[in-house]
Amino acid sequence: MWTKALLASALLGLGLSAQDTLRLNFPADSPVAVISSNWGESRAAARGGALVVDLRTTLKLKNTSRLRLRGISLQVAVQELAAGGKASVSVPSLDVYPGQEFPVKIDLRLLQPNASAGAAVVQVQLDGVLFEDLSFFGPNRLGSRRQLIAWELEARRDRHHLKQVLAKGGEDSLRQSMLEILAQDTARPKLDVRLARAPASFPNERQIEVAFMRQTDFPVEATGGVVMASGNELRIPSLSFENRDKREVRSVELGLIIRDAEGREFSAGSLPAPLSMKPNGTGTVQPTASLQLNRGQGLPLRIESISGFVQQVEFTNGDVWVPPTSFRHEARLLKLVPGSVEEQRLSDIYRRRGMAVLLEELNKQ
C-alpha cells in the first residue's frame, strides 16, 4: 500500500489557490520520509485551454534507513499521459547519513491540458533511492536505478583520480587539476540538443556513416551505424553493437560527437537504448528519437559528420559499467564532453569555497 502525504496551501499573489494540491506519494516502507513540503514560489496560469504550472519549491526529506544515501529520483506529474505533463528530478552525489534530513529542489514547468478543471494537482512519487552499497529501493519506472548507479560509479572514479593526484603531487597538483577542469568547462563548445519523435524521413536528407572511437578493452563495442541528416536535424535508423562480456546486456548508452560544415566539433549528449545481447553476442537498436542541433543564440548547425563511443552499459544482473579515467581523459573527449556530475560539483566547491573545503570534501567518503 502507498501512504499519501497530502499538502496544500493557499498562496495569494502567486497564482495558486486553496484548490491547488501538491500530493507526495511514497511507499509505506520507503527509506525516505517527507518532513515538510509546500508550494514555495510556484505559480499556475491558464494559457489557452491548458494550465501551465511552474513548480518551484524545495522538499525536506529524511533518510530513515540504516545506510548512507547516495542519490534519489522523483517523478513529478500533473498529467502522466499528456505531453509536458510529466517530468523527473534526480539528485546524485549525495552523502546523507541515517537519520539526516536533506533538501530536494524542484524547478519544473508542467502542462495540465484541461484548464477548465480549475485546479492544479501535482503528484510527486518516489522512483528510486540509491544507497552506499549500491542497493536500490523504488519502483524504477523511469529507469532511475541505472542512471543513479552510473552517476555513483563516475563519482567514485573521479574522486579516486583526484585523490591520486593529491597523493602524488600534493595540493599544488590538485590545484592545477581543478584549474584545468574549470578552464576546460569554460572553453568547451556548447550545443543545444532537442529531442523529438523521429519522422519516417526528412526532406533532402543524406546518409552519414557513424565513425566509432576505438574501445578495444570495453565490454561492448559499437560496430556500425548510419544517421540520416538534413540541415541541423538527424535521425538514426539503426546502430549495431557487439557484447564482448560474459554477462548479458540490458541497455547501452552511446555518446555522440558532431562535426559541422566549418570543422568545429560539439558533444551532442548521449543516446540511451534498451538492447538485449547474450554473452559474446550482437544486437541492433533502432532509436525512435530525432535530434535538432543548434549553437548559441539558436543558430542552426549544419551536420557534416558524426562520431560515437560507448558511454555506459547495463547488464541484466544489475551491474552497470562506465568508462575508466584513462578513456575519459582522452584529449578529444576532454575537450568536448562535460565532466561527470561529481567532477562539476567538486570543481564548483573549489571555485566558490577554496582548497581547504575541497580537501575536506574529498576526505568525507
In which residue ranges do the predicted regions lie?
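Hydrophobic h-region of N-terminal signal peptides that target proteins for export
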Residues: 6-18
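Short coil-to-beta strand junction motifs in C2/discoidin
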Residues: 55, 69-74, 117-124, 233, ...
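Short, surface-exposed ligand- or partner-binding patches at beta-edge/loop junctions that are enriched
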Residues: 113-133, 295-317
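Positively charged n-region of N-terminal signal peptides that target proteins for export
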Residues: 1-5
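Low-complexity, acidic Ser/Thr/Pro/Gly-rich terminal tails and inter-domain linkers that flank the onset
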Residues: 19-56, 64, 81, 147-238, ...
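Short acidic, flexible loop segments centered on an aromatic residue
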Residues: 64-83, 127-128, 244-265, 311
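Beta-sandwich strand segments
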Residues: 85-86, 134-143, 265-267, 318-327
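Intrinsically disordered, low-complexity Pro/Gly/Ser/Thr-rich segments with frequent PxxP/GP/PP motifs
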Residues: 81-117, 262-301
